[in-house]
Design a protein with these regions (language model features):
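Right-hand nucleic-acid polymerase module
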Residues: 1-86, 94-215
């Protein structure tokens, strides 16, 4: 007798993304925001997003970025619970020590364009809990829609890459040309605060789950 199976494709897609992004190689989890997510158009947002990531690629990999070498990342666009607040979640493999990559990435986004949010409003930290962070980043994939903006800005290198070979004086100079020591110092304070808040949120969710389990 033939059995009928009802497959929840939305959940399957979301689960698969979470599985991929829970890989320990994705050392950074981030959210990039705009000053007015409700006002910015998709075309403008996409252009800013792509240009930003290309600039990051050029900063860390120099001319190799023009040959297809870049920061490996998956990006997901989201509009918020009310559907009127465009922003982007991402998971990335940091090409340098993740903590300092977070500082640099946040500073560069905050001053990239007049419509990109100040660094205190973005959220870029080293990945703290792989399963939780991947689930949060891909939560809108459950809607089973085609994310053209996120896909276009995402990047995977064609071949395995040893990023340490790019950690040299030339890379350091490119970073210094884009981000000042003062900006890094201020960014560290923000990253430290966001790491602490992320840990607190994880703890609070765990406590709530424990309470529900005892009821």
């Amino acid at each position: 007798m033939q059995q009928n199976y009802k497959i929840n494709w939305q959940q399957c897609v979301s689960d698969k993304w979470q599985e991929v992004l829970a890989d320990e190689a994705y050392t950074v989890t981030g959210t990039l925001k705009f000053n007015k997510g409700a006002a910015i158009g998709r075309t403008t947002a996409s252009k800013i997003l792509n240009a930003y990531w290309h600039k990051l690629d050029r900063t860390f990999f120099g001319h190799a970025a023009n040959k297809g070498i870049g920061i490996e990342r998956w990006i997901f666009s989201e509009y918020g619970s009310a559907g009127d607040n465009l922003h982007f979640h991402f998971k990335a493999k940091a090409p340098i020590e993740p903590y300092y990559f977070c500082c640099i990435a946040n500073v560069m986004w905050s001053k990239f364009h007049r419509q990109t949010a100040r660094n205190i409003y973005n959220w870029i930290t080293p990945t703290i809990l792989k399963a939780n962070s991947s689930g949060y980043s891909v939560k809108d994939t459950r809607h089973f829609t085609y994310d053209a903006m996120g896909l276009e800005a995402s990047h995977q290198n064609k071949h395995a890459l040893d990023t340490t070979t790019f950690q040299n004086a030339a890379q350091a100079q490119r970073i210094i040309n884009k981000v000042s020591i003062e900006e890094i110092t201020k960014a560290r304070q923000i990253v430290d605060l966001q790491i602490e808040e992320t840990i607190q949120r994880i703890y609070q969710r765990q406590r709530k789950a424990e309470v529900r389990g005892t009821q």
